[in-house]
C-alpha cells in the first residue's frame, strides 16, 4: 500500500517538472538577481541565460521535492501505523482467547459448591414488623449442608445468641424452611441445624492439616443477607493458637486468612481450590485479618455429635448459662493490638488491653444500651476488663446494671446495660 503510493507520487513529480508552468514560474523569486556579465557563453557553448535557466530548474525541482517529501513520508508512516493497528489487536486477542476458561479458578470453585451454602436468619418471636406482622430479624449468618437429609453446620454464635428466637434457613434456590438446633458446642463455637428436606447438595469436607501458608482459599456466605457472596484470599497462618486470640477455654489452632469474613458469612465454609471445606468462617478482627475453625477440629465435633444422636440425645457443651447481653467479642491480645494499631490511626497508642465488640445482636440489651461493633470494652462496674473471661464474670455478678467503659475510636464513653436473665 505504501509502495504503490510512493510510485504515484514519483509520476506526479515527473509530470510537474515537464510542465511549462513549472519552468515559467520558477524564476519569479530570483528575477532581481544580476545576470552573468555580458551574456557570454559558458564552457559548453551555452549562454549565461541558459545556465541561469538550468539553475532555476534545479532549484524548482528541489523546492517541489522539499514540499512533497514530508507528505510522502507521512503517507508511508501512516500506512505502517494503519497496518500495525490492523494486525496487533488480532494477535493479542488470539493470545488471550481461553484465559477466562483456563485461569478463573475461583469461579470454578464457586460453581462447584455454592449450592450447598445456606443463609440463616434468627427471628425474634417477641418483636414483630409493623407492616408485615412477621417476627423481626435479630441476627443472621451462614452455614453449609453436610448431609443430604438436611443437616447443616454453622457457628454456635450464629444460632445460640438470644432467647425467644426461632431459626429459619434459606437455600440457594430461594426456598425457606424452619430449622431446629441439634448439636451445640459453645466452647469451639460450632453447631448443627436440621431442616426437613432430602436430596440436598452437600459440601465435601477436606483436610486442614495439609494446608500451607499462601494457599488460595474462598470464603462463601451471606454478608448483609446477600446470599452466595464470595470473597477470596490466601491462608496467612495455619497455626494461630486460641490463646493468641484470648479465646477462653478453647484448644484450637485457628486458620488465619485475608479473605474477608464478616457477620453474615460467619458460619459459612472456607473452601480450597478443590471445592472442599477446610474451615468454618468464624470471625474478623480487622481488614485482612480473619479466622476460621479448621475442618479437622470440626470433624471431631461432628463424630461426637453423631454418637450422641445414635444414643437418642443431643450433643451440647459449653459455658454455664449466664445472663444474656447480646454481643460477640474478642480479647485484644498484644499481637492483635499491634495489628490494629498498625492498620488504624484511631486506636489509642496507650491501649494495652480490652475486649473488642465484634457483633451486636439487634434488639439485645447491648444494642438497647448503645454498644456498637468496633467498641472496645475496658472496664465493667469499675473493674478492669483484660479478656472475655472478665466479661463472663461480670455477667455472673448479681448487679442489675452493668456500667461499661468503652473506647469508640479515641473517645472514651460510658454505656449502661441491663442483661436479660436466662
UniProtKB/Swiss-Prot annotation:
<dbReference type="GO" id="GO:0043065">
    <property type="term" value="P:positive regulation of apoptotic process"/>
</dbReference>
<feature type="short sequence motif" description="IAP-binding">
    <location>
        <begin position="75"/>
        <end position="78"/>
    </location>
</feature>
<keyword id="KW-0720">Serine protease</keyword>
<dbReference type="GO" id="GO:0007283">
    <property type="term" value="P:spermatogenesis"/>
</dbReference>
<feature type="compositionally biased region" description="Polar residues">
    <location>
        <begin position="41"/>
        <end position="51"/>
    </location>
</feature>
<dbReference type="InterPro" id="IPR009003">
    <property type="entry name" value="Peptidase_S1_PA"/>
</dbReference>
<comment type="subunit">
    <text>Interacts with th/DIAP1 (via BIR 2 domain).</text>
</comment>
<feature type="active site" description="Charge relay system">
    <location>
        <position position="157"/>
    </location>
</feature>
<comment type="function">
    <text>Serine protease that shows proteolytic activity against a non-specific substrate beta-casein. Promotes or induces cell death either by direct binding to and inhibition of BIRC proteins (also called inhibitor of apoptosis proteins, IAPs), leading to an increase in caspase activity, or by a BIRC inhibition-independent, caspase-independent and serine protease activity-dependent mechanism. Can antagonize antiapoptotic activity of th/Diap1 by directly inducing the degradation of th/Diap1.</text>
</comment>
<dbReference type="GO" id="GO:0031966">
    <property type="term" value="C:mitochondrial membrane"/>
</dbReference>
<dbReference type="InterPro" id="IPR041489">
    <property type="entry name" value="PDZ_6"/>
</dbReference>
<feature type="propeptide">
    <location>
        <begin position="18"/>
        <end position="74"/>
    </location>
</feature>
<comment type="similarity">
    <text>Belongs to the peptidase S1C family.</text>
</comment>
<feature type="region of interest" description="Disordered">
    <location>
        <begin position="24"/>
        <end position="56"/>
    </location>
</feature>
<dbReference type="GO" id="GO:0016006">
    <property type="term" value="C:Nebenkern"/>
</dbReference>
<dbReference type="GO" id="GO:0007005">
    <property type="term" value="P:mitochondrion organization"/>
</dbReference>
<feature type="active site" description="Charge relay system">
    <location>
        <position position="266"/>
    </location>
</feature>
<dbReference type="GO" id="GO:0006915">
    <property type="term" value="P:apoptotic process"/>
</dbReference>
<dbReference type="Pfam" id="PF17820">
    <property type="entry name" value="PDZ_6"/>
</dbReference>
<feature type="transit peptide" description="Mitochondrion">
    <location>
        <begin position="1"/>
        <end position="17"/>
    </location>
</feature>
<dbReference type="InterPro" id="IPR001478">
    <property type="entry name" value="PDZ"/>
</dbReference>
<keyword id="KW-0053">Apoptosis</keyword>
<dbReference type="GO" id="GO:0005758">
    <property type="term" value="C:mitochondrial intermembrane space"/>
</dbReference>
<keyword id="KW-0645">Protease</keyword>
<keyword id="KW-0865">Zymogen</keyword>
<dbReference type="GO" id="GO:0005829">
    <property type="term" value="C:cytosol"/>
</dbReference>
<keyword id="KW-0809">Transit peptide</keyword>
<feature type="region of interest" description="Serine protease">
    <location>
        <begin position="139"/>
        <end position="302"/>
    </location>
</feature>
<dbReference type="GO" id="GO:0004252">
    <property type="term" value="F:serine-type endopeptidase activity"/>
</dbReference>
<feature type="domain" description="PDZ">
    <location>
        <begin position="325"/>
        <end position="410"/>
    </location>
</feature>
<dbReference type="GO" id="GO:0035234">
    <property type="term" value="P:ectopic germ cell programmed cell death"/>
</dbReference>
<keyword id="KW-0378">Hydrolase</keyword>
<dbReference type="Pfam" id="PF13365">
    <property type="entry name" value="Trypsin_2"/>
</dbReference>
<protein>
    <recommendedName>
        <fullName>Serine protease HTRA2, mitochondrial</fullName>
        <ecNumber>3.4.21.108</ecNumber>
    </recommendedName>
</protein>
<feature type="active site" description="Charge relay system">
    <location>
        <position position="189"/>
    </location>
</feature>
<keyword id="KW-0812">Transmembrane</keyword>
<dbReference type="InterPro" id="IPR036034">
    <property type="entry name" value="PDZ_sf"/>
</dbReference>
<feature type="short sequence motif" description="IAP-binding">
    <location>
        <begin position="94"/>
        <end position="97"/>
    </location>
</feature>
<feature type="transmembrane region" description="Helical">
    <location>
        <begin position="64"/>
        <end position="82"/>
    </location>
</feature>
<keyword id="KW-1133">Transmembrane helix</keyword>
<keyword id="KW-0496">Mitochondrion</keyword>
<dbReference type="GO" id="GO:0006508">
    <property type="term" value="P:proteolysis"/>
</dbReference>
